[in-house]
């Protein structure tokens, strides 16, 4: 383009000169205005404008061809949207960042959380997107892809590290066999173990369902050591941690709730009722025969009473009373009064141990349990499963309820019937009595102390202060009543408590015992072990340190002294005869045992002379005169022989 700035304007005198001057002035004015506008807009940039090309060169954006980065470029003025484009462009270019991060494979569930809550929180707080690989490929770590700005990626890493550190295995925590499974053990106070387990295992079952884990309370043994019990939790690491917090929260809540207690030391809480501790050996007294006592208390007080299940390691069982608060308090007072009344009994007096089963009473008076006793009995092999139960559940339940230890003897005695199984119950007399009652309910009949069932038996083992009691109308008594012992004849009713003996009460008590109606003769059986039983009694009385009270020399004679009817049924087939074994046993101990007395053929044997001889020998013994020979004792019912073997097991 030609440069007209050096061309002089045409003269005013020339043709069209006036018009040329007007155009030149207008151009100058326009150029001046353009420079002013450029100066206002571009500041110093306006200096880059020149007059050549009519000043259009100034319309070009400054620094367009500069080598500076985009951030240094000046956005056009009056363009708010355009002014924001460089920072957004910069952010977009920097957000395209993906980094791989490794996390422990066992912690993936803990990082994700229930329903993805945990990982959603991490993404929201950090602004970083997290993608976890579906599996680890057998490696101990799993890959996570973090996408975001460097700051958001670092924030996500920090949050992931915190979660992994929080869920890192604590003492007792280790990974399970399955993929992603972990096992953690927490210690539960012994007093709170029942709270965590709940009635019938309901509480621990609910905890397992809510947390989605498996919980097992580890019990080393039945002994109550007072030590904390480990609770093993197995499952996903995050769920295991949640389950642990739920258990600790349960213990804290219940512990605070139990701060409100009544006069019995038990918590009170509206519909929760009252918890009354009952000595384990006294549970049978509160329940009563066939539950009669506890039913009476419930009816009188208008409440419901249930014994909470436990592991059998505590000295007390908890009776839970539910109902209106005032009635619960009344029922608790009834139970407490019942226990106090029994504990306040006269020492040496008759106790409630008979239960109307033909058993003699001991001198326990509901006090603290004394020394442990042992009771052996046999049951048919076909009924063994009823006592043991599936997986031993029944026998464990009976042991927990009664507090006694029940065992099936794997090594039966010699010459034992292979069709019978021998069980042993160990515990206090009260525990044994309660366990025996529960076992009889399971098998639907009375247990047999080391022998087949018989309709009659003795009251119990004679104590050092009196001769043996005559056979009573109930089932055989187990040899677990501790001395001092005061056996006596049964009351007028089959379930009445036995009457105590006075030192001179044999003469008066014996006729009263004669008035008992004879049992069904068809149920009686001959006993081949009578000689062994007679030898046992003679030897037993010679070992007593304190002689029994004197008895009349001439006691009334009767043909029913053995508690049997007029007819004697033949001995059952296959009956094992232990007479020779017992004779050999006493021979070794220096005791001569005569042959069993013969019985007249046919009909009921007459033992009047034998009983008269027995009392004469007793009178001679009480007078400090040793008998010259062993009295001929009458054959005893089968229960006597079994009783002797059971008592021999104790001593």
From Swiss-Prot:
Pfam families xrefs: FUBP_C, KH_1
Keyword ATP-binding in annotation: no
Domain KH: 96-160, 181-247, 271-335, 372-439
Modified residues (N-acetylalanine): 2
Chief location category: nucleus
A molecular function GO annotation: RNA binding
PTMs per UniProt: Ubiquitinated. This targets the protein for proteasome-mediated degradation.
GO BP annotations listed: hematopoietic stem cell proliferation; regulation of transcription by RNA polymerase II; somatic stem cell division
Compositionally skewed regions (Basic and acidic residues) per UniProt: 61-73
Cellular location(s): Nucleus
CDD domains: KH-I_FUBP1_rpt1, KH-I_FUBP1_rpt2, KH-I_FUBP1_rpt3, KH-I_FUBP1_rpt4
InterPro entries on file: FUBP_C (IPR015096), KH-I_FUBP1_dom1 (IPR048249), KH-I_FUBP1_dom2 (IPR048250), KH-I_FUBP1_dom3 (IPR048251), KH-I_FUBP1_dom4 (IPR048252), KH_dom (IPR004087), KH_dom_type_1 (IPR004088), KH_dom_type_1_sf (IPR036612)
GO cellular component, one term: synapse
Keyword set includes Nucleus: yes
Gene3D superfamilies the UniProt entry points to: K Homology domain, type 1 (3.30.1370.10)
Low complexity bias (residue ranges): 514-528, 552-574
Function, in words: Regulates MYC expression by binding to a single-stranded far-upstream element (FUSE) upstream of the MYC promoter. May act both as activator and repressor of transcription.
Subunit field text: Found in a complex with PUF60 and far upstream element (FUSE) DNA segment. Interacts with PUF60 and JTV1.
Name assigned to this protein: Far upstream element-binding protein 1
Organism: Mus musculus (Mouse)
Native organism taxonomy: Eukaryota, Metazoa, Chordata, Craniata, Vertebrata
Gene: Fubp1
